[in-house]
């Protein structure tokens, strides 16, 4: 099974992806996580350092695939999760989609691409041009990371458009949304009412999730010294269980941008309950912006 994880930049995709990967490994799966971001920090939480990228390795070998061994590009992370970083072209030049294609090509040359039960693509930001939508060409499912905020749901809506487009020629389905570090769900619920799709899980605001990223550790690793965090891991195990159930998934139909703006802004501009509630909702909006 191949899964592509998308979402607004800074929403916590890499942290979420790493914890999902470990959760899947805990369920007995052989997992490979592929970071698809020029920052090449997707797997930092699994390995504790920035591993060499596929592109760096190819360049050092003058693109002679026959001179590259699996251990040159596949690094072992926490919990037995294997890690690969695609890397990216120089800033302002080249195409990220080409890099993803070269990564998959090399893994196939190494007979590694089909050796895993789960391959998880962690894709940069909310860029859904043809280049960075490339992982969708290989994925069975897409998971969108969001929060209860305006911008994150706008990004999610654009990603659904890419899923719909790719699903025309490829058996791709949206598994659902994962809400990350959010105390409320009103905007998420309003969005999925208008654009029907599953909500896999919603994680509350837990500071240790952010701290784990800084420490370069997954929540599962942190539990070793902080057993009180075990309850957080259960969220990721629940996500893993839902993925492993091979959900039917959907091909979503995005909402037109102006319609979505009107839909979400209406909750704040015309709340039920009058001015006091309006002020409270506006304060909540500012709160989500700070997050």
From Swiss-Prot:
Any GO CC annotation of this UniProt entry: chloroplast
Cofactor binding description: Binds 1 [4Fe-4S] cluster per dimer.
Recorded catalytic activity of this chain's protein: chlorophyllide a + oxidized 2[4Fe-4S]-[ferredoxin] + 2 ADP + 2 phosphate = protochlorophyllide a + reduced 2[4Fe-4S]-[ferredoxin] + 2 ATP + 2 H2O
CDD domains the UniProt entry points to: Bchl-like
GO biological process, one term: photosynthesis, dark reaction
Binding residues for [4Fe-4S] cluster: 95, 129
SUPFAM superfamilies recorded: P-loop containing nucleoside triphosphate hydrolases
Cofactor dependence: [4Fe-4S] cluster
Domain of life: Eukaryota
Sorted UniProt keywords: 4Fe-4S, ATP-binding, Chlorophyll biosynthesis, Chloroplast, Iron, Iron-sulfur, Magnesium, Metal-binding, Nucleotide-binding, Oxidoreductase, Photosynthesis, Plastid
GO molecular function: 4 iron, 4 sulfur cluster binding; ATP binding; metal ion binding; oxidoreductase activity, acting on iron-sulfur proteins as donors; oxidoreductase activity, acting on the CH-CH group of donors, iron-sulfur protein as acceptor
Homology family: Belongs to the NifH/BchL/ChlL family.
The protein's role, per its UniProt record: Component of the dark-operative protochlorophyllide reductase (DPOR) that uses Mg-ATP and reduced ferredoxin to reduce ring D of protochlorophyllide (Pchlide) to form chlorophyllide a (Chlide). This reaction is light-independent. The L component serves as a unique electron donor to the NB-component of the complex, and binds Mg-ATP.
Subunit structure of this chain's protein: Homodimer. Protochlorophyllide reductase is composed of three subunits; ChlL, ChlN and ChlB.
Protein name (record): Light-independent protochlorophyllide reductase iron-sulfur ATP-binding protein
């Amino acid at each position: 099974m191949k899964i592509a994880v998308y979402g607004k930049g800074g929403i916590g995709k890499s942290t979420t992806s790493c914890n999902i990967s470990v959760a899947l490994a805990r369920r007995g799966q052989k997992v490979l996580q592929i970071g698809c971001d020029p920052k090449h920090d997707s797997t930092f939480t699994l390995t504790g350092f920035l591993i060499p990228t596929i592109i760096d390795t190819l360049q050092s070998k003058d693109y002679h695939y026959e001179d590259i061994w699996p251990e040159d590009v596949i690094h072992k992370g926490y919990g037995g999760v294997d890690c690969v970083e695609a890397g990216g072209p120089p800033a302002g030049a080249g195409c990220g989609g080409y890099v993803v294609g070269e990564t998959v090509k090399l893994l196939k040359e190494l007979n590694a691409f089909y050796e895993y039960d789960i391959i998880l693509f962690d894709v940069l930001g909310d860029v859904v041009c043809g280049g960075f939508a490339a992982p969708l060409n290989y994925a069975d499912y897409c998971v969108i990371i969001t929060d209860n905020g305006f911008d994150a749901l706008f990004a999610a809506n654009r990603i659904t458009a890419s899923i719909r487009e790719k699903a025309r020629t490829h058996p791709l389905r949206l598994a659902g949304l994962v809400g990350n570090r959010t105390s409320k769900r009103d905007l998420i619920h309003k969005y999925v009412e208008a654009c029907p799709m599953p909500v896999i899980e919603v994680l509350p605001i837990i500071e240790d999730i952010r701290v784990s990223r800084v420490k370069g550790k997954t929540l599962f690793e942190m539990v070793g010294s902080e057993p009180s965090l075990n309850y957080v891991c259960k969220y990721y195990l629940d996500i893993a269980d839902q993925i492993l159930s091979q959900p039917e998934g959907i091909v979503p139909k995005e909402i037109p941008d102006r319609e979505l703006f009107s839909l979400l802004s209406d909750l704040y501009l015309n709340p039920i309950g009058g001015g006091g509630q309006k002020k409270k909702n506006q304060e909540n909006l500012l709160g989500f912006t700070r997050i």
